[in-house]
């Protein structure tokens, strides 16, 4: 998965999930706002609400998402 794949899926309001280092991440549009809910299996009931640009700019393990996405497994969108 690439950052372009993620951006394209988000442009179509699609849910996206992937695993990185055994941790599941799930991103879905919030029905009540123009933000996205980002869930992590470490805190499954506590989503982070972010704009699309914030999601695309977020870091995982101190690495930009664009560097993490090519390393993920089980990517679905």
What are these regions (language model features)?
Residues 3, 28-32, 77:
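Charge-rich, low-complexity amphipathic helices
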């Amino acid at each position: 998965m690439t950052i372009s794949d993620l951006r394209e899926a988000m442009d179509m309001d699609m849910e996206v999930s992937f695993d990185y280092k055994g941790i599941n991440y799930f991103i879905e549009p919030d029905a009540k706002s123009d933000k996205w809910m980002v869930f992590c299996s470490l805190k499954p009931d506590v989503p982070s609400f972010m704009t699309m640009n914030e999601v695309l700019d977020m870091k995982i393990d101190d690495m930009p998402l664009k560097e993490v996405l090519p390393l993920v497994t089980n990517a679905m969108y």
